[in-house]
Amino acid sequence: GDKITDYARAMFASGKHYLPSDQLTPGRTDYGTNKNFTCIRYAEVLLMHAEALTNGATSSAMTAVAAINAVRERSGMPALSSVTNEQVMEEKYAELAMEWGTRFYDMVRLGKTSELSYDGRTFSADNSFLPIPQTQVDLLPVLGSSK
């Protein structure tokens, strides 16, 4: 398989959609404070649809190829005649690069965490999820039992 050696493929990152300094809202000048929080993009919905279809789901809305090609058309890429799940994941990586750690969570969800180790850094399963704050565990002790 591929050897992952770059930050965008292996770590949580959110660096897209920053505005040029002449378009900043006065008073909102800290790193990241001037960008609106994007919950989800239509391209991501299309890519999730394509992933579900390549994993065996059915749909009357559109095919996996149609979903991928809708994303590719917007960015000026040539259409594909067929797609595999691996191609869908690569398309998702390209389309959503640097957005919200999507690749990181995909790799954890798909059990491909070996791809998250690179440059002498080793991913371990305890890094899959953020810890539950101790104040919440103190309020509801059963939360601490899932370690």
Residue spans for each PLM region:
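Extended, hydrophobic/aromatic-rich amphipathic alpha-helical segments that build helical scaffolds
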Residues: 36-70, 85-94
